[in-house]
Amino acid sequence: MAAPEVSSAGPNMLHPNSRTLTLRGKRGHAAEDSSQGAVSDCKKMHSSLNKVTACYRQLVLCVGGTSDCTRLREELEESRKKAFDLSTDLSNTLMVLLMNEGVSQEDRVELERIWVLFLSTLEFFQQDLCKAHHLCQLFPLHGRRKRLVNTGVIGKTSEVAYRARNIKSPSSSRMHENQQRTERPCSPDLAGQIEHMERMLHDMQMKVSIPIWTVEATEEAWAEVASTCDLDECSDNEILAGEDITSRGCCAHGQSLPGPLCMVS
C-alpha cells in the first residue's frame, strides 16, 4: 500500500532567477515611465519657448516706432531673459536624453523631432536678437538724434508683455539638476547674448548630430493656427475687438458724417 502524500504547509518561495527577472521588469517599467515623462516635459518647454519668442518678436517690431519707450525696452529685457532660461534648460535636457543609450526608440524619435524644432526656434530667436540690437542702436532713448519712425504700430505693448510673463515654465527634477550643473546667468548686454546664442547653436550641432531630413513631421501643416490658445484668451479677444473698432473709422463711433468724408477718415 502506497504511503500517503504529505503536503508541505510552508509558503511558496520564488526561485532566485524569477525574483531577479521581476526586479528587472520593475526597473524597466520605471525607466520607461521616467523617459516618457522627460519627453513630455521637453514638449511643454519647447511650446513655452515658442510662445515667449513670439511675444519677443512682436515687441521688437515696436522698437523705433511711435510706441517706443523705456517701458518697452524693459519688457524686451524681461522676455529676452525668460527665453534665455527656457532655451538653456531645454538644450541641456535634450542633450542628456539624446546621449543616453537607455532611451527607447520611440522616445528617441520624438526627442529628435523636438531637437530639430528647437534648433529652428533658436535660429529665429537669434535673428530677432540681431534685429533688436540694430534697432536699439539706431534709436537710442537717451540722447536721441533721430526721430521715431511712424511705423503704424499704435497702442500699448503691455498686453504682449503680460502674455510673455504669464507663460509657465515646466519644471522637473532632471531639469533642475541640469540647471544647477551648467548654470550661466543671462548676459545683460544684448550683443553678449547674441554671441552666447551662436555658441549654443554650434555646441548643439557638434555634440548631437541629427540629420534634419531623417526627422518626419507628426502633425499636419499649420496645426498650431487651428489650435486654441490657453493664455490670456479674454485679453486677446479684447485686443482684436479694439482693432476691429479702430479699423471701422468714424462709423463705429456713431458719428454721422457724409459718405465721402467718412471714406476719407
Curated annotation (Swiss-Prot):
Spans through the membrane: none
Sequence ranges of Basic and acidic residues compositional bias: 174-186
Disordered: annotated span: 1-37, 168-187
Signal peptide start and end residues: none
Coiled-coil positions: 70-92
Keyword set, alphabetical order: Coiled coil, Signal transduction inhibitor
GO biological process: negative regulation of signal transduction
Purpose of the protein: Regulator of G protein-coupled receptor (GPCR) signaling. Probably acts by regulating the activity of some 'R7' family protein (RGS6, RGS7, RGS9 and/or RGS11).
Family statement drawn from the similarity comment of this UniProt entry: Belongs to the RGS7BP/RGS9BP family.
Protein name (record): Regulator of G-protein signaling 9-binding protein
Organism, scientific name: Xenopus tropicalis (Western clawed frog)
